[in-house]
């Protein structure tokens, strides 16, 4: 059975960029998302994540908040300030307090997933974020209906 066979109904394969300095979390997230049919890009630092986002333009970015050198807040700020990556939806996954998570949302994240996460719940949450962002982008790109020309 292929990995795509495990995808939730109505959800095509998406590219998800995961940015986390913890190699165990990075590999766990990668395995879970691949098992649900997604293409996963891995970035062990914020800087690598930003470079991958610019080059690959994933459908969704998952970013950890607590990382050395460049934390999640700085990563989100850089992504949202860049014309190439500005529209890519970003979800924070963090063990931070609710106040910190809210700062990430105010900085541009569309939401957050608390750590530690349940392996059975994470793919469903990612699917919900993808469905919401795909629906929003479809509404934004659908041209308005043209009215038939009227005779003078």
Regions flagged by a language model, labelled:
Residues 67:
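Receiver (REC) domain active-site loop signature in two-component systems and cognate sites
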Residues 37-44, 52:
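Short hydrophobic/Thr-rich beta-strand motif most characteristic of the beta2 strand and flanking loop
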């Amino acid at each position: 059975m292929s990995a795509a066979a495990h995808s939730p109904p109505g959800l095509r394969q998406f590219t998800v960029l995961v940015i986390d300095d913890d190699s165990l979390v990075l590999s766990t997230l990668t395995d879970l998302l691949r098992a649900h049919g997604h293409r996963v890009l891995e970035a062990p630092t914020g800087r690598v994540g930003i470079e991958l986002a610019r080059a690959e333009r994933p459908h969704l970015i998952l970013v950890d908040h607590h990382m050395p050198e460049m934390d999640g807040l700085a990563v989100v700020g850089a992504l949202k300030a860049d014309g190439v990556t500005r529209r890519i939806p970003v979800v924070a996954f963090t063990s931070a307090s609710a106040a910190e998570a809210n700062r990430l949302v105010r900085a541009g994240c569309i939401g957050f997933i608390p750590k530690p996460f349940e392996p059975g719940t994470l793919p469903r949450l990612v699917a919900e974020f993808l469905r919401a962002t795909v629906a929003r982008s479809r509404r934004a790109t659908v041209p308005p209906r043209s009215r038939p020309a009227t005779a003078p």
